[in-house]
């Protein structure tokens, strides 16, 4: 099959190393993350990637693609410090924009959210109240979403954990 369709690219070597995550830690900052990483170094356990789960953003504003300034006042500097420690950085994202997110109004106004048959924005409360789903069938919505990812890459994020793609409405 792949002889006809093409061989997949080999992921970068660092992606096969050990990943550490905040997972369900809900109240963390750079000092907390450093304590996690320091614990691994003290035990001589090599890490390749540190993954920031959802609370790198303000709680219940997922996804706003913006570091929580109260917990991470200098994201670019922090990521540079982690890179100097030899780590790659991953952040959690999903295809939903919370009603509480500053991006919700923008996405709704520009028609970037999935719509119901009645012309209203499709919203769901499964993960957080009033989530809208980015309409990835809209090329402008895709470009808008990609611009949010590019901004994160530009500040030093190396990869993304793309979550909740399985919950697309039918």
Predicted regions and their residues:
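Carbohydrate-recognition beta-sandwich/jelly-roll modules
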Residues: 1-48, 76-81, 88-89, 93
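Aromatic- and carboxylate-enriched substrate-binding clefts and catalytic-loop regions
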Residues: 46-170
């Amino acid at each position: 099959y792949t002889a006809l369709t093409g061989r997949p690219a080999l992921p970068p070597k660092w992606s096969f190393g050990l990943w550490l995550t905040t997972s369900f830690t809900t109240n963390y900052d750079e000092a907390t993350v450093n304590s996690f990483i320091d614990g691994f170094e003290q035990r001589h356990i090599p890490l390749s990637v540190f993954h920031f789960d959802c609370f790198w953003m303000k709680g219940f504003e997922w996804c706003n693609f913006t570091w929580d300034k109260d917990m991470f006042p200098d994201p670019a500097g922090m990521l540079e410090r982690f890179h100097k420690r030899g780590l790659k950085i991953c952040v959690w994202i999903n295809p939903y924009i919370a009603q509480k997110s500053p991006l919700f109004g923008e996405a709704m106004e520009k028609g970037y959210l999935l719509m119901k048959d009645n012309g209203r924005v499709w919203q769901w409360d499964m993960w957080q109240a009033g989530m809208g789903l980015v309409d990835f069938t809209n090329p402008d919505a895709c470009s808008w979403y990609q611009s949010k990812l590019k901004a994160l890459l530009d500040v030093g994020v190396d990869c993304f954990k793309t979550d909740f793609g399985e919950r697309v409405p039918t």
